[in-house]
């Protein structure tokens, strides 16, 4: 096992906040594997790279010799996490949650070592709690303290409804830490309230409180809003290798170091070396290719990564992407057909030219040929090629003034 200092450096890599660092140091000094918990509510079947920020950190803990608990919130998934929500979230059925959970497991083991991972379902202990147990759990926290949470506070002050079951969510997530005897819990920055709840409940139930490590929410391909499938600015880990590769190679230069730190398993020394190369004049696209190859290989294998790289090179033979790819924002109030986007972005002379190019296979989005049925989602960013010489990284931005 590495020294405490070496472990701490890797644990803190890319992290937003570690509470309480001195407590974690004491836990590490004992020289025993720690129990590292991260919970995931399976609310959708497919994961994207934003979800993997936490999973990557779990893998780093595994590599340091600690015990990782991948907690599937099949019970909490039926409540619906209210974190950051402005309205009550509709609950899922048990069948939906279990179906999604199976797809999660097949995806996360592309990152985690199955032999070193304990998969747990919080229904295992939550289904066994009696009404009296639930009342005891609820008595550990007050409504006033719940309303200190930013999203609840905003809804309360604006006279929006807050259902009682939403107050239960952070209590149940906190109780998961009691049931699992967690030493450390990971979560996104939007989960801090829930993670701190785990510390408080562990104290209330006579346990040593867990440390918490919050990780940032990964920006999507637009480099602005958090990665989200609904915004169209995501990279799905089950997307075809070529699409994943093309999306990653086309991210803004300003975003690539953030992606390296949070998504790559390269050491920070190696990443800093790449940064120095870039500052010395290396083409940023060549650096992004290294990131794209690494991530495609992780989820699809080395051969698929090599094929994606070759295919991307072949696709660009007749129209090499310029180093100074123009950034173009197109205002819209809703999703828009690609023909209209190309026209508004100025990549074609008029709508008729756009239709002709689409019909003849002359339009590529993120390196892939598309037809007139392709719809650009509001908030999405794509590298677009119209014909042989017209290129642009186009973002469909919300035109609030038109609403």
Curated annotation (Swiss-Prot):
The UniProt keywords, alphabetically, are: Aminoacyl-tRNA synthetase, ATP-binding, Cytoplasm, Ligase, Nucleotide-binding, Protein biosynthesis, RNA-binding
Molecular-function annotations in GO: ATP binding; RNA binding; tyrosine-tRNA ligase activity
**GO BP:** tyrosyl-tRNA aminoacylation
- Per the Swiss-Prot or TrEMBL annotation, the motif 'KMSKS' region is positioned at 226-230
Quote the record's binding site residues for ATP.
Answer: 229
Choose one Gene Ontology CC annotation of this protein and give it: cytosol
Q: Which SUPFAM superfamilies does the entry link to?
A: Alpha-L RNA-binding motif (SSF55174), Nucleotidylyl transferase (SSF52374)
Q: What does the subunit section of this Swiss-Prot or TrEMBL entry state?
A: Homodimer.
This protein is called what? Answer: Tyrosine--tRNA ligase
| The organism of origin for this protein | Pseudomonas syringae pv. tomato (strain ATCC BAA-871 / DC3000)
């Amino acid at each position: 096992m590495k020294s405490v200092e070496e472990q701490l450096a890797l644990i803190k890599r890319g992290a937003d906040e570690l509470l309480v660092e001195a407590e974690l140091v004491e836990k590490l000094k004992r020289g025993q594997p720690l129990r590292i918990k991260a919970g995931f509510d399976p609310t959708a079947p497919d994961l994207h790279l934003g979800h993997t920020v936490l999973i990557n950190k779990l893998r780093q803990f595994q590599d340091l010799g600690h015990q990782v608990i991948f907690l599937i919130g099949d019970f909490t998934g039926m409540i619906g996490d209210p974190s950051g929500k402005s309205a009550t979230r509709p609950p899922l059925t048990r069948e939906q949650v279990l179906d999604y959970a199976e797809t999660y497991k097949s995806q996360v083991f592309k990152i985690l070592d199955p032999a070193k991972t304990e998969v747990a379902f919080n229904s295992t202990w939550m289904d066994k709690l009696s009404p009296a147990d639930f009342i005891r759990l609820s008595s550990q926290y007050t409504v006033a303290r719940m309303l200190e949470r930013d999203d609840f506070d905003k809804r309360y002050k604006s006279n929006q409804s807050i259902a009682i079951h939403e107050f239960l969510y952070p209590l149940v997530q906190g109780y998961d830490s009691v049931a699992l005897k967690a030493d450390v819990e990971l979560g996104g920055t939007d989960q801090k309230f829930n993670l701190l709840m785990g510390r408080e409940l562990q104290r209330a139930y006579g346990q040593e409180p867990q440390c918490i490590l919050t990780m940032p929410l990964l920006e999507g391909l637009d480099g602005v809003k958090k990665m989200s499938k609904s915004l169209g600015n995501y990279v799905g880990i089950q997307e075809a290798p070529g699409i994943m590769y093309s999306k990653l190679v086309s991210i803004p230069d300003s975003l690539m170091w953030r992606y390296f730190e949070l998504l790559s398993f390269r050491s920070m020394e190696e990443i800093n070396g790449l940064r120095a190369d870039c500052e010395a004049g290396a083409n940023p696209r060549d650096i992004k290719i290294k990131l794209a190859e690494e991530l495609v290989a992780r989820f699809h294998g080395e051969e698929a990564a090599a094929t994606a790289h070759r295919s991307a090179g072949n696709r660009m033979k007749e129209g090499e992407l310029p180093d100074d790819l123009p950034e173009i924002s197109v205002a819209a109030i809703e999703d828009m057909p690609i023909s209209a986007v190309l026209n508004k972005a100025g990549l074609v002379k008029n709508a008729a030219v756009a239709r002709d190019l689409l019909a003849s296979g002359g339009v590529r989005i993120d390196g892939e040929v598309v037809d007139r049925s392709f719809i650009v989602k509001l908030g999405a960013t794509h590298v677009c090629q119209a014909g042989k010489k017209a290129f642009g990284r186009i973002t469909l931005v919300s035109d609030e003034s038109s609403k």
